Structure formats: structure tokens, C-alpha cells
């Protein structure tokens, strides 16, 4: 491809209202242009990246026997009314009527439609399991689109659906899809983790989210501090799983309220008529390390008021002195000047370790470390920051876990994929399925799974994880072009022009890769800046100066280091560099 025939569409500066670095670079590098709030046109450079990601997904889906289909984005309202999501999905579901006054929706997802399609087909039990998927445009009427394509109204998803004759078959496909998602995201070059999640508006019994690390992420994940291990398998390592931290939106303003006669949490609960789980308590313990004077330093442990500290879990935290040693009330008064029941995490002059259940709370009540006063309406990030989260509380229900790698670190993340076990939630909506099930001699009891990947969002996430001051640093496998050729002053130098054209033609025929030759009449600085900005990983620079020594210059974008390559060795060198990457 020649830049003279290409819509490069680069910008020197991003619009001032763009806050996310991915949004800025996608606009500056000419990947997208905004049409309206939450709506974007994909320009040629962005579309090339998009198609490469889609093809990787198609390759991996094909390996597990998934079949591609295409369903309409416009769906009849009757399907959504039957499932209950016509009202249950909320205002993000865009509803409209056609000229015949019939109701429709723009589909944010396709569970209702695909389940009806499969249930209408006359299929034998031997044809199951069946996996279908599509790569298609979706629409979600976001109240406040933001961060470019990370939170857009229109987006492209891979949504897959599987159908099974029993739960065991569903579990097998679920496990295969789980591993396939690992493969896809690893091939793309993402740094991510997996968390067990709530099914949300889609529903079902079991679901897992794939979360990519990003400073601009809207989700918070507490991840066990395990070096070089960003991939946690929920089956093989149930004791070491990331935890999704989702503090609820703050409703109240923090207030300091006097309660001079209160001497316990129970009295506070009774006076203010609030549930006990809305209160936190702070316990000061001795740390493992000592001061110069041989006294132990101190730590504050913060848990819900209705929870107890787990001695078993505490023993796994290396910062805490074992056996556990809580300080006496007299020492607490020396530190805070207040009674133990008034201890709280705000303005406490010692390090804190916070139970992950507390990290998810909003508008909670805590001691103020001041005599006779409590903070009401406390919220994380607004009123107090947390840096260290751990699993501290005693297990009181059967499905909790003990995390052997107990200290957790908090990361902002963006959801890039989600898989669900739906069971029979959508299949039971269809009368013909129920009739077939009752009449079938094999007593078919179909189960359903669904599996999504946010493709357009992934591009933004990759940029969030791969950029420098000059632009995007694409992983080779999804770069819009593998190689850029920059001929310096090619319109003044016949030699430069001829060599550049010869190399371009040879590489196209020998290697067959995507190449962009910059044949514009531009200053070299502009050409270098544009190629770096759009993130082409391999760059050839051809000039009279280098050709005088029968050489060209090669730069690998991520290392930004120039190498001189002899012309006779160039093709072999590039094959080794590019094809093997």
C-alpha cells in the first residue's frame, strides 16, 4: 500500500476533551473518527487492526468446532418481552417502532434470537453439542459514553452460543471456551486476568470475566501478588483467584456526627437504625518488623463490623506478627486519643490492610479516631484511599475460599470478555423446544452457554498497554502494517526511488506481508512521526547516504534502535525479523 493512495488521517494533537490515552491515540493515528456521542467511523488503519483481531478469533473458534453465523441487529420486541428483558434490561435497550407500529429493539446481545433459531430447527440429539458464533455490530444506549470505544454506544462483538444435551457437555464446552479465550488474548498480546463474576442482565448460574489491566479501567481487581503470573486458572487454582472489587456509587456526603454516649457498635446501630454490615471496625495489631528501639511497628486491619478476623488467614500474611497480638486499649488511646470503639481507617497514622469485603463497600460508617464522633457516608477513593487488600474475615458460608497467596494488589481493569453458563433460562421460553423435549425418547434436556468478546474495546485496551511518547506500539500480529518503507527525498533522488520500489516489490512477492511505502512529498520528520504514531513495528529507511555504502537502515519500533543492513542481505534479514515475529 502507498501512502499517496491511502487515507492516513493522522493528527498532530488530540481534541482537548479526550482523557483516555487510547482515545487520544486512536484519533491522532487515524484509526477512528467520532460521528456522534458514542458512535465512531473506523478508518482504514483502524479497520486493518480490527480485521486482524477478528481473524485470530475466527481461527481459534474454528479449532473448537464453532460455526460462524450472522443474525440481524434489529430484533422483534416479542422475543425480549418473552424473556422479561424488555423491561428488565433497562434504558440501555434501544426500542423503536417501524411504519406498521411494530416494536423492535437494536440488539445489545442475541440470546433470545439464537435460542429461538436453534429451538425451531429439527435436530437429533447426536448433533449436539452445537456451537455457533457471530462477529457483529451491537448497540447499547449508554447514558454517558466515554473513553472513546471503551464505553461506546455502538460496538463490535464476538458473541458465541453453545447448546448441549446435558450439564456435563456444557461444562466441557465452557472449559474449552475458557482456554480458547486464553489463547486468543495471549496471541493478541494482552496482559489480563480472569475473575468469577455475577451473571448480570444476561443471567445464568456461572460466569467468568476476562479483565485486561489498564490505568483507565472502570473495574477494580484485587489480584494475588504472584510474580509473573497474570493467568489464573479457576479450575486448577481455586485457592488463588483475582477478586473483582466493585465499590458501589457514592450516595451520601461524608459527615462527622457526634455520638458522645455511644460505647459500642451495637449501641450505634440501635441509635441510628442502620444495618450492622454498613459499619466497619478497625483492629490494631503488631507488625512483623520492629523499630530501632526494638518495639514492634503497628498495622490496622479493617473488616466489616459483623465479621470476625480469621486467624488462619492472618497467619498467611507476612506483614503481621504471629502469634497475633492486638494492642491494649491504653495504647490505642495514646495513638488516637480515643476509645477503641472509635477507631477508624481515616487519618490513622499506621499502614492499613483492608478486607476485600470492606473494599467493596460504599457509604459506610467508621470511627473517627476522635472522642465521641463517627464518620458517616464514607466512600473509597473519595474519602480514603486503599493500597493493600487481603482476605481477612472468617468464612461463615460454604462457598467462600481461603486464599493461600493472601496479600492482594489492586489494579484497574477493563472487561474484554465474558463467558456464561445459562442453563435452560432462554430455551424454556420456546414452546416447540419444550414439546420436543417431552416427546424425545432420549429425554433431551438442553443446556445453553454464551461467550462474548468486545472486539472494538480490545483495540483500545491494547493501546492502553502498548504506547510511548511517539505513538502506538502494536504487537506485530495485529499491527495495521508489518513494515513501513520510508524513502528519503525519493522525488529528488532517482537512486532512492528505484531501490525503494525494488525492495517494495520484492518483499510483497517473497514475504507477502502488509507493507506501507511512504511515497508522499513530505519532510522526513513528518514521515517518521506519522509512521511512529500509527505504530508500524518494522521500519526501513532508504537514503542516498546509506545507499552510498550499499546499505539501508532498519528500526524496530519498540526498541527505537537503528541498524545498518547490507542490501544483499536485506531480504533474508527481514524474513528472519518479520516472519518469525
Curated annotation (Swiss-Prot):
Its main location: cytoplasm. Keywords: Aminoacyl-tRNA synthetase, ATP-binding, Cytoplasm, Ligase, Nucleotide-binding, Protein biosynthesis. One of its GO terms (molecular function) is ATP binding. Its EC number is 6.1.1.15. It catalyses: tRNA(Pro) + L-proline + ATP = L-prolyl-tRNA(Pro) + AMP + diphosphate. It is found in: Cytoplasm. GO terms for cellular component: cytosol. Consists of three domains: the N-terminal catalytic domain, the editing domain and the C-terminal anticodon-binding domain. Belongs to the class-II aminoacyl-tRNA synthetase family. ProS type 1 subfamily. Homodimer. Catalyzes the attachment of proline to tRNA(Pro) in a two-step reaction: proline is first activated by ATP to form Pro-AMP and then transferred to the acceptor end of tRNA(Pro). As ProRS can inadvertently accommodate and process non-cognate amino acids such as alanine and cysteine, to avoid such errors it has two additional distinct editing activities against alanine. One activity is designated as 'pretransfer' editing and involves the tRNA(Pro)-independent hydrolysis of activated Ala-AMP. NCBIfam families: PRK09194.1, proS_fam_II. This is Proline--tRNA ligase. It comes from Blochmanniella pennsylvanica (strain BPEN). The gene is proS.
Amino acid at each position: 500500500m502507498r501512502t499517496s493512495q491511502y487515507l492516513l488521517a493522522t493528527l498532530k494533537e488530540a481534541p482537548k476533551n479526550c482523557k483516555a490515552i487510547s482515545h487520544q491515540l486512536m484519533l491522532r493515528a487515524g484509526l477512528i473518527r467520532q460521528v456522534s456521542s458514542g458512535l465512531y467511523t473506523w478508518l482504514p488503519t483502524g479497520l486493518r487492526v480490527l480485521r486482524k483481531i477478528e481473524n485470530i478469533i475466527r481461527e481459534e473458534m474454528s479449532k473448537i468446532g464453532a460455526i460462524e453465523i450472522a443474525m440481524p441487529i434489529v430484533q422483534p420486541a416479542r422475543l425480549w418481552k418473552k424473556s422479561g428483558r424488555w423491561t428488565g434490561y433497562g434504558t440501555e435497550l434501544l426500542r423503536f417502532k417501524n411504519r406498521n407500529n411494530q416494536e423492535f429493539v437494536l440488539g445489545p446481545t442475541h440470546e433470545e434470537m439464537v435460542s429461538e433459531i436453534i429451538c425451531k430447527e429439527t435436530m437429533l440429539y447426536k448433533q449436539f453439542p452445537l456451537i455457533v458464533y457471530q462477529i457483529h455490530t451491537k448497540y447499547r444506549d449508554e447514558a454517558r459514553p466515554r473513553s472513546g470505544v471503551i464505553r461506546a454506544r455502538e460496538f463490535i462483538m464476538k458473541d458465541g452460543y453453545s447448546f448441549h444435551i446435558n450439564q456435563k457437555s456444557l461444562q466441557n464446552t465452557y472449559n474449552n471456551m475458557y482456554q480458547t479465550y486464553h489463547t486468543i488474548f495471549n496471541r493478541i498480546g494482552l496482559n489480563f486476568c480472569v475473575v468469577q463474576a455475577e451473571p448480570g442482565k444476561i443471567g445464568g448460574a456461572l460466569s467468568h470475566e476476562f479483565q485486561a489491566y489498564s490505568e483507565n479501567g472502570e473495574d477494580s481487581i484485587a489480584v494475588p501478588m504472584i510474580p509473573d503470573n497474570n493467568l489464573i486458572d479457576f479450575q486448577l487454582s481455586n485457592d488463588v483467584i483475582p477478586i473483582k472489587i466493585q465499590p458501589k456509587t457514592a450516595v451520601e456526603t461524608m459527615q462527622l456526627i457526634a455520638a458522645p454516649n455511644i460505647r459500642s457498635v451495637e449501641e450505634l446501630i440501635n441509635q441510628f437504625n442502620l444495618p450492622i454490615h454498613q459499619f466497619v471496625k478497625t483492629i490494631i495489631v503488631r507488625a512483623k518488623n520492629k523499630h530501632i528501639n526494638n518495639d514492634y511497628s503497628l498495622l490496622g486491619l479493617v473488616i466489616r463490623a459483623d465479621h470476625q478476623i480469621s486467624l488462619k488467614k492472618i497467619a498467611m500474611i507476612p506483614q503481621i506478627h504471629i502469634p497475633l497480638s492486638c494492642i491494649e486499649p491504653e495504647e490505642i488511646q495514646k495513638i488516637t486519643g480515643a476509645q477503641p470503639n472509635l477507631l477508624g481507617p481515616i487519618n490513622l497514622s499506621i499502614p492499613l490492610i483492608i478486607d476485600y469485603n470492606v473494599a467493596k463497600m460504599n457509604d459506610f460508617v467508621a470511627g473517627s479516631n476522635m472522642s465521641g464522633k463517627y464518620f458517616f457516608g464514607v466512600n473509597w477513593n473519595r474519602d480514603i484511599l486503599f493500597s493493600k487488600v487481603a482476605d481477612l474475615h472468617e468464612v461463615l458460608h460454604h462457598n467462600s475460599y481461603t486464599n493461600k497467596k493472601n496479600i492482594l494488589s489492586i489494579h484497574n481493569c477493563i472487561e474484554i470478555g465474558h463467558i456464561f453458563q445459562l442453563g435452560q433460562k432462554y430455551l424454556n421460553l420456546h414452546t416447540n423446544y419444550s414439546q420436543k423435549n417431552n416427546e424425545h425418547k432420549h429425554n433431551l434436556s438442553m443446556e445453553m452457554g454464551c461467550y462474548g468478546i468486545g472486539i472494538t474495546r480490545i483495540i483500545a485496551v491494547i493501546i492502553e498497554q502498548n504506547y510511548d511518547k511517539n505513538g502506538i506500539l502494536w504487537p506485530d500480529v495485529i499491527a495495521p502494517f508489518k513494515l513501513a518503507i520510508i524513502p528519503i527525498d525519493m522525488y529528488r533522488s532517482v537512486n532512492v526511488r528505484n531501490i525503494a520500489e525494488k525492495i517494495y516489490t520484492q518483499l510483497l512477492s517473497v514475504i507477502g506481508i502488509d507493507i506501507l511505502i511512504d511515497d508522499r512529498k513530505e519532510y522526513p520528520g513528518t514521515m517518521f512521526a506519522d509512521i511512529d504514531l500509527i505504530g508500524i513495528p518494522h521500519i526501513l529507511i532508504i537514503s542516498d547516504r546509506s545507499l552510498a555504502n550499499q546499505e539501508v537502515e532498519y528500526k524496530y519500533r519498540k526498541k527505537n534502535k537503528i541498524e545498518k543492513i547490507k542490501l544483499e542481505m536485506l531480504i533474508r534479514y527481514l524474513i528472519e525479523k518479520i516472519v518469525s515475529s
